[in-house]
Every structure is written in C-alpha cells, then in structure tokens.
From Swiss-Prot:
Residues 1-22 form the signal peptide. This is Uncharacterized lipoprotein SAS0399. A lipid is attached at residue 23 (N-palmitoyl cysteine). InterPro entries: Csa, Csa_sf. It comes from the Bacteria. Pfam families: DUF576 (PF04507). It is found in: Cell membrane. Belongs to the staphylococcal tandem lipoprotein family. Keywords: Cell membrane, Lipoprotein, Membrane, Palmitate, Signal. The keyword Lipoprotein applies.
C-alpha cells in the first residue's frame, strides 16, 4: 500500500516489510507465546502514555544496546499521523515528526502534508513545515499563510500525549502474524468504538466511518528489543479501497547519530 511506503520514508526507515502470516491454528501454544512477547515488548512504551509534557523525555532513558556511541544519551523520535482517502485513488496523509535530543535537550521536527496516489507513475506530493518544541509547545519556524493550517500545527498533539493504555493487559486473543524472512511481528485486536482512545481519536480527527477500528501493534526488529528496529501502533478504521482511514503513532528511542 502506498501509504505504508510513505510512512516508512517519513521516519527514515528505508526497509520494505513483507507481512506473512506465520502462525497457524495447529500451533496455538506458540501463537499465544508470541502474543505475550509482542505485548511485553510494547508494555514499557505504552506505560509511559500519556506523556503530557514531552520535555519529560529529556530525562527518560530508553532501550540501549551496542549501537550507541560512548556518551550518547540518545534521541527520542515521535510521530503521529492521520491518513484518509477523500477521493478515489488518493490518500491524504498528514502528521508531525519530532526528534528530542537528550544530549543537547533540544527538540526539532516538522509537520507534513502529503497526497499518495494509486497510479504507478504518480509520485507523492509532500510539503514540510519545520517546528521546534519550547516549554512543551510546538513553535512553527516556517511562514505559513494559511491560518487554519498554522493553527493546526501550533496546537498539534501527539497521540502519545493523551492516549491511555491502562487496560492494555486485558487485550487478549489477538490475530498474530510474523514474517519468515525478516524480524517483523504484528498483533491485531478488534477495538470497540466505546474505547476511550477511540473516542478521543474521533474527537481529534475527521473520522467519518462508524466502523470500529482494528488496533495493530507492529514490531520491526528483534522482538526482545533493538535500537535499529522500531515499533508503532495503528488504529485502522477502514481498509476498504477509497475509504482508507488510519491513525499511526510511533515512539522510538535510538542513537542520536543520523537523526535529524
């Protein structure tokens, strides 16, 4: 799907992930174990939600491994995006990426808008608006004449700032899948429209479908932890062609080198 390719580009991860269902009904015990591992991998991150003051991350340590250089305190990368098909063959995608460098206690990033087309020969039309974080507020660095867009950027909130996953341990019997050729894992859960996170997303974004979403937990990399891979969550409200609607959230901790 074109949107997935675009999402990978925005977070500077140039890896094509092929999702292949890896666990059958005849291997129920193994599937249950994999679900427990996926949930355990997400627990430390989701326990941080809601991160009401993003600047608290300057003092928050994350998973460290040999990829970190000596003395590097690491950088937190946040992304929240909303994708929706508003016309046939086209998906409007917008969101914000923020890099919080713990070494210099500075956070910079950008808000982006993009149109992803189905046609093979059409490229994405993307615009970026640079921002920084000061006193837990988004400060727009570029001149934006569109007052509606300007207000949207300056008042942007990451999903991780208002999400609440205190009931996460109660999520059970997910649809588990993994890839055979790369370390890639997914757990999907059908979520009710009465869920507090779903209600909040419907308040924040123009989600027109009344369908209840599927929550997907995705891991790219070692399921036990890795600073090279990443984890993201997705609320998928519709996968129907020309009705695609999804919200993605990404909170990652990694080496500061190469992050900008």
């Amino acid at each position: 799907m074109g949107y997935l390719k675009g999402f990978a580009l925005y977070i500077s991860i140039l890896i094509l992930i092929v999702f292949i269902a890896g666990c059958g009904k005849s291997d129920k015990t193994k599937e249950d174990s994999k679900e427990a591992q996926i949930k355990k991998s997400f627990e430390k991150t989701l326990d941080m939600y809601p991160i009401k003051n993003l600047e608290d991350l300057y003092d928050k340590e994350g998973y460290r491994d040999g990829e970190f250089k000596k003395g590097d305190k690491g950088t937190w990368t946040l992304l929240t995006s909303f994708a929706k098909s508003n016309k046939p063959g086209e998906i409007d995608d917008e969101g914000m990426v923020l890099f919080l460098n713990r070494n210099i206690k500075k956070a910079t990033g950008y808000y982006y808008t993009s149109k992803v087309h189905d046609e093979f020969n059409e490229k994405e039309h993307q615009k970026k608006y640079h921002v920084e974080l000061k006193n837990n507020k988004i400060v727009l660095l570029d001149n934006v004449e569109d007052s509606k867009l300007k207000n949207k950027i300056e008042n942007f909130k990451f999903f991780s700032q208002y999400a609440d996953f205190r009931d996460f341990k109660n999520y059970k019997n997910g649809n588990i899948s993994s890839a055979d050729n790369v370390p890639s894992f997914d757990a999907e859960y059908q979520i009710s429209n009465t869920d507090k996170n779903v209600k909040k997303l419907r308040e924040v974004y123009p989600i027109t479908t009344k369908k209840s979403p599927v929550l997907k937990l995705h891991i790219d990399g070692d399921i036990k932890g890795s600073s090279i891979g990443y984890k993201n969550i997705e609320f998928n409200f519709s996968k129907v062609k020309d009705e695609e609607t999804a919200v993605r959230d990404f909170v990652n901790f990694g080496p500061s080198d190469g992050v900008s």
